[in-house]
Amino acid sequence: MWRTIKKLGNYYMEIKYNYTTIFPVPIHQFDISGFDQIKNKLIDYAYDMQKRDSVGKTASNRGGWQSKSFIIGNEDDVLHSTLMNCLSGFPTIKKSFGLNGEAWININKTGNYNAKHHHPNSNLSGVLWIKIPENSGRIEFISPVDFQTDREIRSYTEEFRDENRIHHSYYFPPIEGRMLVFPSHLIHHVTQNKSDEDRLSVSFNITLNT
């Protein structure tokens, strides 16, 4: 809280200032301890899937390979088990809600990226980073708040903007073994892979059921 004393004629007034941030957008984060023990298995899983279906599908991917979607939990393997272990332990979702989802593999080679998009017909979406070389692309979310002009954002101090994350967009650095889960309506994209290696990840959509 901020306050100041101002003089008004022969009187003094105390002015108090405070603010409240409303309508926050939660971004959930899971970090897998000991990810190095399963990383190579997940990499092999991704490339094996690509060998079985080299065409894949085209969605937001620009030049990259994307697998066709598969139901999470339908197979008893390292990928399905990893996703289920993370999502079944969601501490901020009521136990009365069930989670059903589908996932797909992403392989972005040098120069590939994912264009701006959102995920309709689902409640939550997410990504698990498997193999992330340096400078291979990061995820950027576009603010759902409709600022009429850039002037409002620029008028705030940098400290205030950073403290309350008031920006047009927000980047998350990709880290191997980390999973992000976010509201499906959030527009986002993945920047270009500027490394000399493949970038591997698993994306997914979740529907919440009561």
Question: Where are the model-predicted features located?
Answer:
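Non-heme Fe(II)/2-oxoglutarate
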Residues: M13-S96, N106, Y113
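Short histidine-centered beta-strand/loop micro-motifs
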Residues: K95, N114-H119, T191-K194
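Catalytic core of non-heme Fe(II) oxygenases with the double-stranded beta-helix
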Residues: I105-V181, D198, L208
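Histidine-centered metal-chelating micro-motifs
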Residues: N112-Y113, H185-H189
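Ligand-binding loop in jelly-roll beta-barrel domains
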Residues: I187, T191-S201
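Short peripheral tails and domain-boundary helices/loops at the edges of structured domains
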Residues: V202-T210
